[in-house]
Amino acid sequence: AYIDTHTAKTERQSVLVSLDRDGRVLRVDVTVFFEPAQYMAPQDFLRQYDGAVLHEELVIRRGIRPIAGASFTGRAVNNAVRRVLALDQVLQSTALSDVQ
């Protein structure tokens, strides 16, 4: 699991991105959110990432439905999930090359 802290619109938020052994998203949870509550990503938005892997369709308005009225939050969460998936790929490939 990874925690990504970033700015949503003007304030910080942290998301916990849990991955399985194969690098697929198990779940995404918001752990800290300092923006107004109405801009927080709802659970049905976050559940879209369940089972996701890093690919070109993992973006808002392609493979991910946007959040009405909270586009900054949606983009920030999407960017965080993509960062975590990319970081995990790098760390996993580094770990595999260290074993060989």
Residue ranges of predicted features:
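Flexible, solvent-exposed loop/hinge segments and secondary-structure transition points
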Residues: A1-R75, N79-Q100
